[in-house]
């Protein structure tokens, strides 16, 4: 009989804010908020330390709301590169316990410690050791969810380890019926707000209710996604802890929320679509791939009454040429846009293949067009993202300069 796996989900408490407090001792006893743009009160709270959360501050809320609840809070601009560096330091610590470490996000990592127990002790002993190492060396408090698979480890961390005194909780096939099944279905790993709403309308309010729901009905309604939801609710997850989670990438995309409502295509929207197309194609070229399916997404400015679309088109041949992708994006957008103000745009390139060879085209100098993109990439990689830039990005609608100062949409 195969030995049951032991999987950890290690999560850093209020990661961005905790890093700032660890590196600035004078902030130790003060509430700290990390916000995307502290100069703009409409900015979003990216992280709030426990002292700020005690005053009612929550992540993803507007900064002005957070400051009303906690006016004494110290508001800091994020340092994304520093957080990435610290995250890598934490990964290095975890890799001393096992070589099976999978970053799930910048502040969460899965570990498979099944084969590590003879060296480092019981799962509880290993979890406590990891907590101590990270606190001593990084100054950040880690919580650990333990389970026989990734799904249960994640649920154990999110719903129990984050709330109990020692920051460690084990969820098993034996105790999940008493511990996990009574939880609201919205607290289950993989269930977002929209899915929660759909499940509630079907009479499913708890994880246990989802576990007991007829599988065939879930599959009929949501296909494979319905099957995965049912499996998770029943504590089933066969996905391994993978050290190469980026292998086999299916698509390359980029999106952004605009700083204001964009209403005019020629003066505003097309500038951002061109910038997004260029970013996607640059990343594709750096990855050595081309794509044959182009998609564009748009979200309207009214968040109370969501509008928008997500449409795609298959090209005649794979490409990573900015102009090819932009032309497809432009046609798609103009076909499906309802003319209303836009607040978010996205461009995606999928059905990827290697760029080693490409279909010869008798009517275009394809090699010349593709080489141009690689030359521009070389200049940017050597001298910076803004070393060479399109004239359209210099207009009021352009976002290229602003994005160049950020990582993942936030300041470096």
Curated annotation (Swiss-Prot):
Compartment(s) of residence: Cytoplasm
Catalytic activity, as annotated: DNA(n) + a 2'-deoxyribonucleoside 5'-triphosphate = DNA(n+1) + diphosphate
Listed Pfam families: IMS (PF00817), IMS_C (PF11799), IMS_HHH_1 (PF21999)
Domain of life: Bacteria
SUPFAM superfamilies reported in the protein's UniProt record: DNA/RNA polymerases, Lesion bypass DNA polymerase (Y-family), little finger domain
GO cellular component: cytoplasm
Protein name: DNA polymerase IV 2
Organism of this sequence: Bacillus subtilis (strain 168)
Taxonomic classification: Bacteria, Bacillati, Bacillota, Bacilli, Bacillales
């Amino acid at each position: 009989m195969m030995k049951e796996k032991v999987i950890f989900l290690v999560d850093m408490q209020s990661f961005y804010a905790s890093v700032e407090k660890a590196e600035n001792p004078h902030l130790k006893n003060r509430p700290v908020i990390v916000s995307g743009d502290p100069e703009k009160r409409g900015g979003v709270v990216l992280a709030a330390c426990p002292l700020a959360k005690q005053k009612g501050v929550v992540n993803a809320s507007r900064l002005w709301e957070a400051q009303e609840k906690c006016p004494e809070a110290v508001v800091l601009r994020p340092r994304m590169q520093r957080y990435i560096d610290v995250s890598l330091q934490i990964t290095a610590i975890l890799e001393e316990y096992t070589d099976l470490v999978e970053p799930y996000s910048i502040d969460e990592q899965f570990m498979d410690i099944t084969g590590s127990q003879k060296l480092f002790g019981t799962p509880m002993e290993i979890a406590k050791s990891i907590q101590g190492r990270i606190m001593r060396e990084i100054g950040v408090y880690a919580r650990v969810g333990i389970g026989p698979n990734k799904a249960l480890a994640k649920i154990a961390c999110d719903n129990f380890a984050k709330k109990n005194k020692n920051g460690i909780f084990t969820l098993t096939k034996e105790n999940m019926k008493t511990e996990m099944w009574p939880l609201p279905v919205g607290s289950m790993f993989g269930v977002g707000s929209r899915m929660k709403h759909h499940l509630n309308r079907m009479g499913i309010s708890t994880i246990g209710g989802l576990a007991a729901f007829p599988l065939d009905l879930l599959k009929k309604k949501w296909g494979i996604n319905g099957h995965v939801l049912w499996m998770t609710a029943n504590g089933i997850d066969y996905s391994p802890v993978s050290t190469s989670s980026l292998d086999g990438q299916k698509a390359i995309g980029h999106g952004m929320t605009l700083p204001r409502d964009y209403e005019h295509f020629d003066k505003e929207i097309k500038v951002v679509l061109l910038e997004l197309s260029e970013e996607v194609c640059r990343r594709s070229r750096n990855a050595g791939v081309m794509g044959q399916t182009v998609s564009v997404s748009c979200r309207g400015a009214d968040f109370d009454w969501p509008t928008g679309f997500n449409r795609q088109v298959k090209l005649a041949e794979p490409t990573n040429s900015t102009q090819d992708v932009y032309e497809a994006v432009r046609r798609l957008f103009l076909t499906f846009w309802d003319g209303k103000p836009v607040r978010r745009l996205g461009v995606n390139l999928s059905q990827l293949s290697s760029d080693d060879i490409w279909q010869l085209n008798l009517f275009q100098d394809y090699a010349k067009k593709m080489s141009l993109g690689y030359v521009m990439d070389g200049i940017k990689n050597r001298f910076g993202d803004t070393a060479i830039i399109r004239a359209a990005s210099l207009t009021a609608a352009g976002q290229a300069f602003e994005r160049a100062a950020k990582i993942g949409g936030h300041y470096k």
